[in-house]
């Protein structure tokens, strides 16, 4: 009787364990992308900056290169002081992680509501990110976004 109870308990444990939804934890560039999206949707400049290494380089659409913490802060400060981020979508994403380096790519859609009261603007384009694991966390070291080329339909959802 005791062994039967032990077997039934073990079987029940296995059934419950393997029937739970399994989801791989996000790592590398994918984890940084998730943190960046959350920070942007919250319009939180400091949280956005935490996703970048202090020596990162950023190319935003229609903006000059931002190299290092000071220039990256200035680039996002300008964007967030003039606009409220309403939506951020990354689509057609791909990720590859090799040791302490990770690459991410895909398409983006960023919906901005100008604080001047103008109509919302939807920016679409393509991006490539390189992230590194530094000090126990993943951060962008390269973030390159480019506007969607003329004549394309933009990101697919």
In which residue ranges do the predicted regions lie?
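Short helix-adjacent coil turns
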Residues: 40-44
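A solvent-exposed, acidic/Ser-Thr-rich amphipathic alpha-helical stretch
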Residues: 27-32, 45-100, 107, 118-122, ...
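Short beta-strand edge/turn micro-motifs at domain boundaries
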Residues: 124-151
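Sec/Tat signal peptide C-region and signal peptidase I cleavage site
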Residues: 20-24
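Bacterial N-terminal signal peptides
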Residues: 7-19
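Positively charged n-region of N-terminal signal peptides that target proteins for export
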Residues: 1-7
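Beta-strand elements of well-folded, non-transmembrane domains
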Residues: 110-114, 131
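A short, structured loop/turn motif at beta-sheet edges
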Residues: 95-102, 131-137
């Amino acid at each position: 009787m005791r062994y039967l109870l032990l077997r039934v308990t073990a079987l029940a444990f296995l059934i419950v364990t393997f029937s739970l939804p399994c989801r791989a934890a996000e790592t590398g560039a994918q984890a940084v992308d998730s943190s960046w999206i959350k920070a942007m949707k919250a319009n939180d400049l400091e949280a956005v900056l935490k996703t970048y290494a202090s020596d990162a380089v950023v190319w935003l659409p229609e903006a000059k290169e931002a190299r290092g913490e000071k220039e990256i802060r200035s680039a996002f400060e300008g964007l967030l002081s003039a606009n409220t981020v309403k939506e951020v979508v990354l689509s057609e994403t791909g990720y590859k992680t090799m040791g302490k380096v990770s690459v991410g790519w895909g398409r983006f859609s960023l919906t901005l509501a100008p604080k001047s009261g103008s109509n919302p603007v939807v920016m679409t384009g393509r991006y490539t990110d390189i992230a590194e694991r530094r000090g126990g966390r993943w951060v962008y070291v390269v973030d390159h976004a480019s506007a969607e080329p003329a004549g394309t339909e933009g990101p697919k959802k």
